[in-house]
Amino acid sequence: MLDALTETTASGRRLDDRRQFEHHWMMNPATRAILDDAVDAAMAARGGVPLDLVLDVGCGAQSNVVFPGARRVIGTDLDLEGLKNNLTVDAAIAADIVATDLPTECVDAIACIYVLEHVPHPDRVFGKFARALRPGGVLIIAVPNVAAPKARVTRLTPLSFHRFVYRRLLSRKGDDEGMPFATVLDGSIRPDRLENLAEVCGLIVLRRTDFEDNKQLALRRKFKLTGLPWNAIRAAFRGMSRGRMDPELSDIVMVLQRPFQDPATGTLAESLAAAQG
Protein backbone atom coordinates (compact mmCIF):
# COMPACT_ATOMS: atom_id res chain seq x y z
CA MET A 1 0.00 0.00 0.00
CA LEU A 2 1.16 3.51 -0.77
CA ASP A 3 0.92 4.74 2.81
CA ALA A 4 3.09 1.87 4.02
CA LEU A 5 6.10 2.82 1.89
CA THR A 6 9.14 4.47 3.42
CA GLU A 7 9.53 8.17 2.68
CA THR A 8 13.14 8.87 1.73
CA THR A 9 12.81 12.66 1.74
CA ALA A 10 10.14 15.17 2.59
CA SER A 11 10.30 18.84 1.81
CA GLY A 12 7.99 19.88 4.63
CA ARG A 13 7.16 23.04 2.68
CA ARG A 14 4.31 24.59 0.81
CA LEU A 15 5.15 25.76 -2.67
CA ASP A 16 2.97 28.46 -4.17
CA ASP A 17 4.72 27.93 -7.49
CA ARG A 18 6.48 24.59 -7.78
CA ARG A 19 7.49 25.50 -11.31
CA GLN A 20 10.23 27.76 -9.92
CA PHE A 21 12.28 24.63 -9.19
CA GLU A 22 12.26 23.36 -12.77
CA HIS A 23 15.69 22.69 -14.16
CA HIS A 24 14.86 20.00 -16.71
CA TRP A 25 17.29 20.86 -19.48
CA MET A 26 15.45 18.73 -22.04
CA MET A 27 12.06 20.41 -21.57
CA ASN A 28 11.76 22.29 -24.85
CA PRO A 29 9.11 25.02 -25.15
CA ALA A 30 6.84 22.96 -27.43
CA THR A 31 6.63 20.01 -25.03
CA ARG A 32 6.31 22.36 -22.08
CA ALA A 33 3.33 24.03 -23.74
CA ILE A 34 1.66 20.67 -24.43
CA LEU A 35 2.02 19.58 -20.81
CA ASP A 36 0.82 22.97 -19.57
CA ASP A 37 -2.26 22.66 -21.78
CA ALA A 38 -2.85 19.20 -20.34
CA VAL A 39 -2.74 20.56 -16.80
CA ASP A 40 -5.11 23.37 -17.76
CA ALA A 41 -7.57 20.86 -19.21
CA ALA A 42 -7.37 18.69 -16.10
CA MET A 43 -7.92 21.59 -13.73
CA ALA A 44 -10.79 22.98 -15.80
CA ALA A 45 -12.51 19.58 -15.65
CA ARG A 46 -12.35 19.71 -11.86
CA GLY A 47 -14.31 22.94 -11.90
CA GLY A 48 -12.33 24.62 -9.17
CA VAL A 49 -12.38 21.67 -6.76
CA PRO A 50 -8.96 21.82 -5.01
CA LEU A 51 -6.43 19.00 -5.14
CA ASP A 52 -5.70 17.44 -1.77
CA LEU A 53 -3.22 14.74 -2.82
CA VAL A 54 -1.23 14.31 -6.04
CA LEU A 55 0.86 11.26 -7.02
CA ASP A 56 3.73 11.85 -9.47
CA VAL A 57 4.83 8.47 -10.81
CA GLY A 58 8.37 8.12 -12.13
CA CYS A 59 9.21 11.75 -11.45
CA GLY A 60 12.91 11.23 -10.74
CA ALA A 61 14.82 14.45 -10.09
CA GLN A 62 12.05 16.71 -11.35
CA SER A 63 8.31 16.65 -11.89
CA ASN A 64 7.34 17.36 -15.48
CA VAL A 65 3.73 18.13 -14.56
CA VAL A 66 2.91 20.59 -11.79
CA PHE A 67 -0.69 20.80 -10.58
CA PRO A 68 -1.41 24.27 -9.16
CA GLY A 69 -2.74 24.53 -5.64
CA ALA A 70 -2.09 20.92 -4.66
CA ARG A 71 -1.95 20.56 -0.88
CA ARG A 72 0.49 17.63 -0.95
CA VAL A 73 2.49 15.99 -3.76
CA ILE A 74 4.05 12.54 -3.40
CA GLY A 75 6.71 11.61 -5.93
CA THR A 76 7.75 8.02 -6.55
CA ASP A 77 10.52 6.49 -8.64
CA LEU A 78 13.09 3.69 -8.57
CA ASP A 79 15.83 6.34 -8.87
CA LEU A 80 16.59 7.09 -5.22
CA GLU A 81 19.31 9.63 -5.97
CA GLY A 82 17.10 11.47 -8.40
CA LEU A 83 14.28 11.60 -5.87
CA LYS A 84 16.56 13.17 -3.29
CA ASN A 85 17.13 16.07 -5.69
CA ASN A 86 13.46 16.60 -6.53
CA LEU A 87 12.35 19.96 -5.14
CA THR A 88 8.86 19.91 -6.63
CA VAL A 89 7.41 17.19 -4.36
CA ASP A 90 6.56 17.25 -0.67
CA ALA A 91 7.48 13.60 -0.13
CA ALA A 92 9.70 11.33 -2.22
CA ILE A 93 9.15 7.58 -2.00
CA ALA A 94 11.38 4.95 -3.61
CA ALA A 95 8.97 2.39 -5.03
CA ASP A 96 8.25 0.18 -8.03
CA ILE A 97 4.84 1.19 -9.33
CA VAL A 98 4.41 -2.23 -10.96
CA ALA A 99 4.78 -4.04 -7.63
CA THR A 100 2.99 -1.46 -5.49
CA ASP A 101 -0.70 -1.72 -4.64
CA LEU A 102 -2.47 1.62 -4.57
CA PRO A 103 -5.46 2.13 -2.26
CA THR A 104 -8.80 2.65 -3.93
CA GLU A 105 -9.85 6.30 -4.37
CA CYS A 106 -6.80 7.69 -2.57
CA VAL A 107 -5.59 10.56 -4.79
CA ASP A 108 -7.03 13.54 -6.66
CA ALA A 109 -4.49 13.60 -9.49
CA ILE A 110 -1.82 11.37 -10.99
CA ALA A 111 0.99 12.35 -13.36
CA CYS A 112 2.73 9.56 -15.27
CA ILE A 113 5.08 11.12 -17.80
CA TYR A 114 7.07 8.71 -19.97
CA VAL A 115 6.86 5.76 -17.60
CA LEU A 116 4.40 3.24 -19.05
CA GLU A 117 6.66 2.43 -22.01
CA HIS A 118 9.29 1.12 -19.57
CA VAL A 119 7.15 -1.33 -17.58
CA PRO A 120 5.69 -4.76 -18.30
CA HIS A 121 1.90 -4.98 -18.39
CA PRO A 122 1.32 -1.21 -18.48
CA ASP A 123 -2.41 -1.88 -18.85
CA ARG A 124 -2.42 -3.26 -15.31
CA VAL A 125 -0.60 -0.17 -14.04
CA PHE A 126 -3.15 1.99 -15.85
CA GLY A 127 -5.89 0.04 -14.07
CA LYS A 128 -4.23 0.79 -10.72
CA PHE A 129 -4.25 4.47 -11.55
CA ALA A 130 -7.93 4.38 -12.50
CA ARG A 131 -8.90 2.67 -9.23
CA ALA A 132 -6.73 5.05 -7.18
CA LEU A 133 -8.46 8.18 -8.49
CA ARG A 134 -11.12 9.71 -6.32
CA PRO A 135 -14.33 10.87 -8.02
CA GLY A 136 -13.37 13.85 -10.15
CA GLY A 137 -9.72 12.78 -10.07
CA VAL A 138 -7.55 13.43 -13.12
CA LEU A 139 -4.73 11.50 -14.78
CA ILE A 140 -2.13 12.89 -17.18
CA ILE A 141 0.03 10.41 -19.07
CA ALA A 142 2.68 10.83 -21.76
CA VAL A 143 3.94 7.89 -23.80
CA PRO A 144 5.52 7.22 -27.17
CA ASN A 145 3.04 6.16 -29.83
CA VAL A 146 4.09 2.51 -30.03
CA ALA A 147 2.68 2.25 -33.56
CA ALA A 148 4.91 5.06 -34.85
CA PRO A 149 8.22 4.37 -36.63
CA LYS A 150 10.29 5.88 -33.81
CA ALA A 151 8.90 3.41 -31.27
CA ARG A 152 9.21 0.48 -33.68
CA VAL A 153 12.90 1.21 -34.23
CA THR A 154 13.40 1.60 -30.48
CA ARG A 155 11.75 -1.73 -29.78
CA LEU A 156 13.84 -3.59 -32.37
CA THR A 157 17.23 -2.21 -31.29
CA PRO A 158 19.26 -2.84 -28.11
CA LEU A 159 19.77 -0.37 -25.27
CA SER A 160 23.43 -0.03 -26.29
CA PHE A 161 22.31 1.41 -29.62
CA HIS A 162 19.99 3.85 -27.86
CA ARG A 163 22.87 5.04 -25.69
CA PHE A 164 25.04 5.43 -28.80
CA VAL A 165 22.37 7.63 -30.39
CA TYR A 166 22.05 9.75 -27.27
CA ARG A 167 25.80 10.23 -26.83
CA ARG A 168 27.03 10.50 -30.41
CA LEU A 169 24.06 11.94 -32.28
CA LEU A 170 22.25 13.91 -29.57
CA SER A 171 25.43 14.94 -27.69
CA ARG A 172 24.21 13.75 -24.31
CA LYS A 173 27.20 13.50 -21.96
CA GLY A 174 25.90 11.30 -19.16
CA ASP A 175 23.04 10.21 -16.94
CA ASP A 176 22.58 13.75 -15.64
CA GLU A 177 21.60 14.76 -19.17
CA GLY A 178 18.85 12.22 -19.65
CA MET A 179 20.29 8.94 -20.90
CA PRO A 180 17.81 6.28 -22.05
CA PHE A 181 16.37 3.44 -19.96
CA ALA A 182 15.41 -0.03 -21.12
CA THR A 183 12.03 0.03 -22.81
CA VAL A 184 9.24 -2.51 -23.21
CA LEU A 185 6.86 -0.51 -25.44
CA ASP A 186 4.00 -2.91 -24.86
CA GLY A 187 1.24 -2.77 -27.45
CA SER A 188 -1.39 -2.06 -24.80
CA ILE A 189 -0.29 1.61 -24.69
CA ARG A 190 -1.09 2.18 -28.35
CA PRO A 191 -3.28 5.31 -28.37
CA ASP A 192 -6.50 3.64 -29.48
CA ARG A 193 -6.02 0.84 -26.96
CA LEU A 194 -5.43 3.35 -24.18
CA GLU A 195 -8.68 5.05 -25.11
CA ASN A 196 -10.50 1.71 -25.02
CA LEU A 197 -8.86 0.84 -21.70
CA ALA A 198 -9.95 4.17 -20.27
CA GLU A 199 -13.56 3.41 -21.17
CA VAL A 200 -13.35 -0.03 -19.55
CA CYS A 201 -11.89 1.55 -16.39
CA GLY A 202 -14.60 4.18 -16.21
CA LEU A 203 -12.43 7.14 -17.19
CA ILE A 204 -13.28 9.94 -19.60
CA VAL A 205 -10.67 11.07 -22.13
CA LEU A 206 -10.67 14.85 -21.77
CA ARG A 207 -7.87 15.60 -24.18
CA ARG A 208 -5.40 13.82 -26.44
CA THR A 209 -2.47 15.57 -28.09
CA ASP A 210 -0.28 13.87 -30.69
CA PHE A 211 3.08 15.54 -31.23
CA GLU A 212 6.69 15.02 -32.31
CA ASP A 213 9.28 14.11 -29.69
CA ASN A 214 12.14 16.60 -29.42
CA LYS A 215 14.74 13.85 -29.91
CA GLN A 216 13.20 12.73 -33.19
CA LEU A 217 13.03 16.35 -34.34
CA ALA A 218 16.70 16.86 -33.47
CA LEU A 219 17.73 13.74 -35.39
CA ARG A 220 15.64 14.75 -38.41
CA ARG A 221 17.31 18.12 -38.50
CA LYS A 222 20.74 16.56 -38.09
CA PHE A 223 20.19 14.32 -41.12
CA LYS A 224 18.32 17.03 -43.05
CA LEU A 225 15.01 15.17 -43.08
CA THR A 226 13.00 18.36 -43.28
CA GLY A 227 10.93 20.20 -45.86
CA LEU A 228 10.01 18.34 -49.04
CA PRO A 229 11.88 15.07 -48.27
CA TRP A 230 10.18 14.74 -44.89
CA ASN A 231 6.78 15.67 -46.30
CA ALA A 232 7.23 12.92 -48.92
CA ILE A 233 8.03 10.37 -46.20
CA ARG A 234 4.99 11.45 -44.20
CA ALA A 235 2.78 11.17 -47.27
CA ALA A 236 4.11 7.68 -48.00
CA PHE A 237 3.42 6.47 -44.46
CA ARG A 238 -0.05 7.98 -44.47
CA GLY A 239 -0.79 6.31 -47.78
CA MET A 240 0.47 2.88 -46.72
CA SER A 241 -1.44 3.07 -43.42
CA ARG A 242 -4.60 4.47 -45.03
CA GLY A 243 -4.27 7.64 -43.04
CA ARG A 244 -3.75 5.98 -39.67
CA MET A 245 -0.05 6.76 -39.23
CA ASP A 246 1.88 10.01 -39.46
CA PRO A 247 5.56 9.38 -38.57
CA GLU A 248 5.90 12.95 -37.31
CA LEU A 249 3.40 12.30 -34.51
CA SER A 250 5.69 10.10 -32.46
CA ASP A 251 4.28 10.73 -28.96
CA ILE A 252 1.01 11.44 -27.18
CA VAL A 253 -0.18 13.21 -24.05
CA MET A 254 -3.57 12.15 -22.72
CA VAL A 255 -5.71 13.74 -20.01
CA LEU A 256 -8.32 11.56 -18.33
CA GLN A 257 -10.80 11.93 -15.51
CA ARG A 258 -12.90 9.75 -13.26
CA PRO A 259 -16.35 11.38 -13.24
CA PHE A 260 -17.42 13.07 -10.03
CA GLN A 261 -20.44 10.78 -10.16
CA ASP A 262 -21.42 8.00 -12.52
CA PRO A 263 -24.62 9.40 -14.08
CA ALA A 264 -26.26 5.99 -14.41
CA THR A 265 -25.44 4.95 -10.84
CA GLY A 266 -26.48 8.32 -9.48
CA THR A 267 -29.83 8.24 -11.27
CA LEU A 268 -30.58 4.73 -10.01
CA ALA A 269 -29.62 5.61 -6.43
CA GLU A 270 -31.75 8.73 -6.50
CA SER A 271 -34.69 6.83 -7.97
CA LEU A 272 -34.50 4.13 -5.30
CA ALA A 273 -34.23 6.72 -2.53
CA ALA A 274 -37.22 8.59 -3.90
CA ALA A 275 -39.25 5.38 -4.14
CA GLN A 276 -38.50 4.50 -0.52
CA GLY A 277 -39.44 7.99 0.62
Residue ranges of model-derived segments:
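S-adenosyl-L-methionine-dependent methyltransferase catalytic module, highlighting the catalytic core
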Residues: 123-124, 128, 138-272
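Short catalytic micro-motifs in class I SAM-dependent methyltransferases
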Residues: 113-118
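Solvent-exposed polar/charged
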Residues: 66-67, 131, 199
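Helix-to-beta-strand junctions that scaffold the AdoMet/dcAdoMet cofactor pocket
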Residues: 119-120, 133-134
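Conserved aromatic
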Residues: 51, 119, 188-189
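Conserved N-terminal segment of class I S-adenosyl-L-methionine
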Residues: 1-105, 109-111, 126, 210-211, ...
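Conserved phosphate-binding and hydrolysis motifs of nucleotide-dependent enzymes
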Residues: 108, 136-137
